[in-house]
A protein has these predicted regions:
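Active-site-adjacent structural elements that line small-molecule/cofactor binding pockets in enzymes
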Residues: 1-220
């Protein structure tokens, strides 16, 4: 929240996307006020990605209940925030929004069921490809587009991936991911870091970005 607020204040053109806020760990009323502040500071350039997270230690660190890591709960909390922003069912809490209906919401959904639920409260996908695999990205886009067709909406398609450039690219990725994925255990983190992300040259990165664009991505 602090970093996004600072970026909102220091910039004037770029879109600010949070990918992702694990909203199931937090109070939705307080979150609504915090995100409204970023929306105001950025003059409407803020987009909010939400999800349930995958690290139990993150929940434990703030006293949140890991059993609440559910998409149904996430949907409820997003709707509470949207009610506050719209001021339809709750008294105005402030701060005032710059965007008329609040920030655009993207869902950090991975599985098919999560994507189906995301249709009810989001404007699209804040996806992630663990192995920087174009087919994985295409499949996720197709599932989201199919899910949104049922509500006659055109989803925003955003994805992301880890990458490293240069001669030490794979080694750099391994160093980062062994630390980042350490909660999985050293052996599993080490194994996953051998294939995760894209390790290559600037040309490799540009070519992959073009593939993602051709797959229908609106942003990476």
């Amino acid at each position: 929240i602090s970093t996004l607020s600072a970026v909102a204040a220091w910039t004037s053109r770029v879109e600010i996307i949070a990918t992702i806020s694990v909203l199931t760990m937090h109070d939705p009323v307080l979150s609504a006020k915090q995100f409204a502040t970023i929306d105001m500071l950025s003059e409407g350039r803020f987009t909010l990605g939400v999800g349930v997270g995958g690290r139990e230690e993150d929940y434990e660190s703030i006293g949140a209940n890991w059993s609440q890591r559910r998409w149904a709960l996430l949907a409820d909390k997003v709707k509470i925030m949207q009610s506050i922003w719209s001021k339809e069912h709750l008294p105005a809490l402030g701060p005032n929004l710059f965007s008329s209906n609040g920030p655009q919401i993207l869902a950090g959904a991975v599985g098919p069921k999560a994507m189906e639920m995301a249709v009810n409260f989001s404007d699209g996908l804040a996806g992630f490809s663990f192995n920087a695999d174009i087919q994985e990205i295409k499949d996720s886009f197709e599932r989201v587009v199919s899910a949104f067709e049922h509500v006659e909406k055109s989803p925003r398609l955003v994805t992301s991936f880890w990458f490293g450039l240069g001669d030490s690219a794979r080694e750099d990725i391994q160093i980062h991911l062994k630390r980042y994925l350490g909660w999985m255990g050293d052996d599993l983190a080490s194994m996953l870091s051998n294939t995760a992300g894209l390790a290559g040259t600037e040309r490799d990165l540009k070519d992959f970005l073009l593939e993602i664009k051709d797959a229908g991505a609106t942003d990476v």
